[in-house]
Amino acid sequence: RREYRLADALNAARDIIAGYDFLFLDCPPSLGLITLNALVAADGVLVPLQAEFFALEGVSQITRTIDRVRRTLNPRLMLHGIVLTMMDKRNNLSELVASDVRAFFK
């Protein structure tokens, strides 16, 4: 199936990548076939999130997507964390977004 192409390629190269502790796959922000392949091949996900007004909308979308992929295609997929980007501690909005993200995952 098309969703497993990256997982199959990484499995075929397991001798080459066995010496690495982590393999990072940088994906586009949309849920296309490339991102779906990465989620199927991955053990975990780190989500970069800009500290902006609609940030939590993106968080809820990605958590639903990860849950759906875990149920249907990759049972070992886990959300390992959110990495806040464009964070400006002088900006009240950045602090509010950080606080909201922490509350979302409690």
What positions do the PLM features span?
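Short glycine-rich substrate-engagement loop in P-loop NTPases that contacts/grips substrate
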Residues: R1-L6
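Conserved catalytic-core segment of NTP-binding enzymes
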Residues: N11-K106
